[in-house]
Amino acid sequence: MRSDWLDPAILDHVLAALTPENELALRVSLATGLRIDDVLHIKSQQVERGQRFTVTERKTGKKRRIYIPELLYSAMLRQSGRYFVWENRVDPKRPRTRQAVWKDLKRAAKLFRVSDSLNITPHTARKVYAVEAFAKYGRVDRVRDLLNHGDEGTTALYLMAEALTARKLKGRPQLRGR
């Protein structure tokens, strides 16, 4: 099932209900457009070198230079473990799993009663990033480069995420009242 786009203001509320570590991971994903697995595999050494560094995407093997904004950067430094910024709870030599972040996000989305018809996952942050980048730059090719997509068609799907979510909801609010 595809992940859905979520209004950034509502996503902010949902992120506030996560554990601090998972909230930080998703905020880094929102700021950089990285997949959650790539965020979780950021090593402490990389962050200690500065706010700008290169990440090798785990899904595609492509290299990508990213910049971490100051607030997120200092939070990453504070929480950084010996090997990874997001350490695994059992083995510090391994990163936190994307499933752990997924589970926490699902719990928070349920807590905030985000519509049952929406599939909110860590990939939602990447879709929000894409929609915001398109609003800022207005060019599909620019967003494609930011997401490191090989095909503009893939990027177009991300850019349509907001409209697809609106169609899916058909006038229903994203947050349900009691």
What is the predicted role of each segment?
Residues 47-50, 139-159:
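Short, polar N-cap/turn motifs at the start of nucleic acid-interacting alpha helices
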Residues 4-32, 36:
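Basic, Lys/Arg- and aromatic-enriched nucleic-acid-binding interface segment
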